[in-house]
């Protein structure tokens, strides 16, 4: 077994970041004007605390007064006292001024009674101004989506949740989801950039694009790559989330990602961004947002993107086009939204993973200087999608909601695998045409009720989900050729198929019913979530000449989460989650291609600490996740034992010093195979699971030049095994990025210029050996040095 990779290059920056004392964000005092607020429904104490903080006023109250009480939240423009009155409706409490900028709460007097003065204590601090949802530094949002539990502040969440803002996405010049997750130490991209598709790993387990939710709905977003210009927020939840969002279509258990769609803000948005990437990628992005009608209740947000040109690799080009329209209505009791989108992505010469036959040594990535995919290979993906959502407040304590989404995807590939047969880099080119059509229909309905029993507050959630997906695969095979990884040969484009693949038709229906109750104790300082989801997995797969395969499995998955806010700055949390996952399907490269395996259970136990110092937050968590493992033997995919990943995570984000922002962390991972066939691989490390991942990104606003920001990022990924026998190993790697941006105004136009260089040292390395269960093993090659330049004009 190998020794642990060195952590030395990252130790000092991380220790310095941990040692930085938070500097409180400045508040602004109430000036008597109405301001815009968006306070989520939940416990009354939390709602009042947040509102007072955003309004920049002081509120003092006896904790016993608000314990166990709930609030329907607040959304719109309000004055300070008007906002307090709305939050307090039905609570039996009243607001009383206590001096300039200060207030207290008293019980509503009964008729003929005298009010008793209580001894108050302060429960609120500084306000955060207009960007209330953004944590200090603006890169991470305080609130994130938790599916049926709604949106919550990260300090009140019994999970490891990080939500990246659209501001962070823009400043990273992120084009797809792979660019955003590069900032997270627990997440890695596991397929080549500008390949046929994007895939990821979270906590050492694979995450498919099809398991990325869109406003809480699975299966709506494009299957193979997701453009980021549509995203208002990117929520990354570590660990299984079956209770929260239902069954993930492809069974990702290491974590989940939710893309929150953009909405029109109170201020008009009109932005155009011109983009350029090295080797000729040119493009533009338009972002327009407006609100209309009485109280600006109607909103429209449009994002359109077009980018095309050559990439960093020879004979490779990429074109992406997307258009997403978001409409919304916000009234006193009703909130509606509709999102419609179209995305197209064409790649010529897409890179492939590099597989190795048994006994072949891992090649040196530095010796690869050319694109080893044939120039006639291509990937064509077209997705049309939409989602409709609605919420209605039946009363101040009861809300019902519903959402429905749909997508149609059409995909066409001409590709070949890259499987090395010797140490000299020889591989057989086996061209294959592959067509796939997907249709998804998904829906959820639910209700949320706030009430109290004695001194205990309750937030009760009931949710019913259904996901229905059909897909049809077809294809053809062509005559083989021979090429070399280090000296690729250009072969003739295939014309006449030598064999046709049997068409397959598969339908998956995932349905579930979930009930959860979040109980609040001790003045909302302790939040206990108890829940369970009754799940059903139905799979029906057919292929001409083969017997139909059908599965209909049911299971109940319990969940528990607890948060103890020992102080406003410190939260302790723990959770236990289970999930039922649709079984793996043998890939087209397997001898038993198309075979569908039975659904399986996964389990997670996690505990952690969250420390919010005002302008810097650090989280530390330990976790253990167990799930069945699969392996390929003599060309056949088979289930084999269990994979157990346990680890330690550190996350850091914020602005510890004025004008200095950090974003990063580390993950130590012990990924072990157990109960394998005949015990042959027991105790070995799982495929593609590095011992150590570490990230550190820093931004510095130069005080000498107003508007100028310098950026830097370092990424470390430990060594990884390519095979379960642990005989083939890819070395650890580091990547360094540098950048700058300059914001200024020209008349009435706001201008932001951005420039960055990814992989400054232009190092070649094997970025990942992680592959999903049921997929042929392979290595992902790094992307060469990449220049990104953009100019954003705000009118």
What are these regions (language model features)?
Residues 53, 58, 73, 119-267, ...:
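Acidic, small-polar-rich N-terminal luminal/periplasmic segments of exported/outer-membrane proteins
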Residues 460, 574, 605, 687-795:
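Conserved C-terminal beta-signal and adjacent last beta-strands/turns
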Residues 389-393, 399-405, 409-415, 598-655, ...:
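Membrane-embedded beta-barrel scaffold of Gram-negative outer-membrane proteins
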Residues 346-360, 468-477, 559, 563-606, ...:
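Surface-exposed extracellular loop regions of Gram-negative outer-membrane beta-barrel proteins
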Residues 522, 622-626, 639-724, 792-794:
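Gram-negative outer-membrane beta-barrel transporters
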Residues 229-232, 242-323, 329-335, 384, ...:
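Outer-membrane beta-barrel translocator/receptor signature
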Residues 307-311, 324-393, 406-438, 477, ...:
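Acidic/polar loop-and-plug regions of large Gram-negative outer-membrane beta-barrel proteins
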Residues 328, 438, 456-461, 465-467, ...:
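Structural signature of Gram-negative outer-membrane beta-barrels, strongest in the C-terminal barrel
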């Amino acid at each position: 077994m190998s020794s642990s990779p060195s952590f030395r290059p990252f130790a000092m920056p991380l220790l310095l970041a941990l040692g930085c004392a938070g500097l409180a964000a400045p508040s602004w005092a109430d000036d008597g004007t109405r301001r815009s607020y968006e306070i989520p429904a939940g416990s009354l104490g939390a709602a009042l605390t947040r509102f007072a903080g955003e309004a920049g006023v002081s509120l003092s109250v006896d904790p016993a007064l608000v314990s166990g009480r709930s609030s329907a939240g607040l959304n719109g423009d309000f004055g300070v006292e008007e906002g307090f009155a709305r939050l307090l409706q039905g609570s039996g409490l009243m607001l009383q001024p206590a001096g300039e900028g200060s207030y207290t709460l008293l019980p509503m007097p009964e008729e003929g009674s005298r009010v008793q003065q209580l001894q108050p204590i302060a429960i609120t601090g500084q306000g955060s101004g207009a960007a209330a949802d953004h944590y200090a530094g603006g890169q991470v949002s305080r609130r994130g989506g938790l599916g049926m539990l709604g949106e919550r502040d990260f300090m009140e969440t019994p999970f490891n949740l990080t939500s990246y803002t659209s501001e962070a996405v823009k400043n990273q010049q992120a084009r797809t989801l792979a660019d955003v997750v590069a900032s997270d130490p627990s997440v890695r991209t596991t397929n080549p950039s500008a390949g046929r598709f994007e895939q990821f790993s979270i906590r050492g387990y694979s995450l498919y694009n099809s398991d990325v939710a869109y406003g809480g709905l699975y299966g709506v977003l494009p299957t193979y790559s997701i453009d980021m210009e549509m995203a208002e927020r990117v929520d990354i939840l570590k660990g299984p989330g079956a209770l929260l969002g239902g069954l993930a279509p492809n069974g990702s258990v290491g974590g989940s990602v939710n893309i929150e769609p953009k909405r029109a803000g109170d201020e008009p948005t009109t932005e155009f961004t011109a983009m350029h990437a090295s080797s000729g990628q040119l493009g533009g992005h338009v972002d327009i947002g407006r609100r209309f009608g009485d109280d600006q209740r109607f909103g429209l947000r449009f994002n359109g993107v077009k980018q095309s040109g050559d990439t960093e690799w020879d004979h490779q080009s990429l074109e992406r086009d997307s258009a997403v329209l978001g409409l919304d209505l916000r009234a006193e009791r009703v909130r509606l939204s509709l999102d419609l989108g179209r995305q197209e992505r064409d790649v010529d010469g897409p890179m492939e993973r590099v597989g190795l036959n048994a006994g072949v040594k891992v090649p040196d990535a530095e010796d690869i200087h050319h694109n080893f995919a044939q120039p006639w290979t291509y990937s064509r993906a077209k997705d049309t999608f939409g989602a409709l959502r609605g919420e209605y407040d039946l009363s101040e304590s009861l809300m019902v909601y519903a959402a429905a989404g749909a997508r149609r995807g059409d995909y066409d590939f001409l590709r070949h695998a890259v499987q090395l047969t010797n140490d000299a880099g020889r591989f057989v080119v086996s061209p294959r045409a592959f067509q796939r059509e997907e249709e998804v229909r998904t829906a959820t309905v639910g209700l949320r009720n706030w009430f109290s029993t004695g001194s205990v507050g309750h937030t009760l959630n009931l949710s019913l989900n259904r996901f229905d997906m059909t897909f049809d695969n077809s294809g053809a095979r062509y005559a083989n050729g021979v090429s070399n990884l280090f000296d690729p040969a250009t072969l003739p484009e295939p014309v006449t198929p030598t064999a046709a693949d049997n068409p397959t038709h598969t339908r998956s229906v995932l349905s579930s019913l979930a009930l959860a109750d979040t109980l609040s104790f001790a003045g909302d300082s302790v939040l206990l979530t108890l829940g369970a989801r009754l799940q059903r997995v139905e799979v029906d797969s057919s292929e001409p000449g083969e017997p139909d395969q059908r599965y209909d499995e049911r299971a109940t998955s319990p969940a528990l989460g607890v948060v103890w806010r020992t102080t406003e700055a410190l939260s302790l949390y723990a959770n236990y989650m289970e999930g039922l996952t649709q079984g793996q399907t043998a890939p087209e490269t397997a001898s038993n291609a198309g075979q569908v395996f039975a659904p399986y259970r996964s389990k997670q136990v996690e505990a952690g600490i969250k420390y919010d110092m005002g302008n810097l937050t650090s989280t530390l968590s330990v976790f253990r996740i167990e799930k069945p493992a699969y392996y390929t033997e003599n060309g056949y995919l088979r289930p084999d034992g269990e994979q157990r990943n346990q680890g330690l995570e550190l996350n850091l984000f914020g602005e510890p010093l004025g004008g200095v922002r950090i974003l990063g962390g580390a993950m130590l991972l012990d990924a072990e195979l157990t109960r394998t066939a005949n015990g042959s691989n027991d105790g070995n490390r799982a495929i593609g699971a590095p011992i150590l991942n570490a990230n550190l990104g820093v931004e510095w606003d130069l005080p000498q030049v107003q508007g100028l920001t310098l950026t830097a990022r370092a990424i470390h990924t430990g060594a990884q095994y390519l095979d379960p026998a642990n005989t083939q190993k890819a070395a650890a790697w580091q990547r360094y990025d540098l950048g700058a941006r300059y914001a200024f105004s020209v008349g009435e136009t706001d201008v932001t210029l951005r420039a960055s260089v990814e992989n400054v040292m232009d190092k070649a390395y094997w970025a990942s050996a992680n592959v999903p269960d049921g997929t042929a093993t392979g290595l992902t090659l790094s992307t060469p040095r990449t220049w990104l330049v953009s100019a954003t004009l705000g009118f």
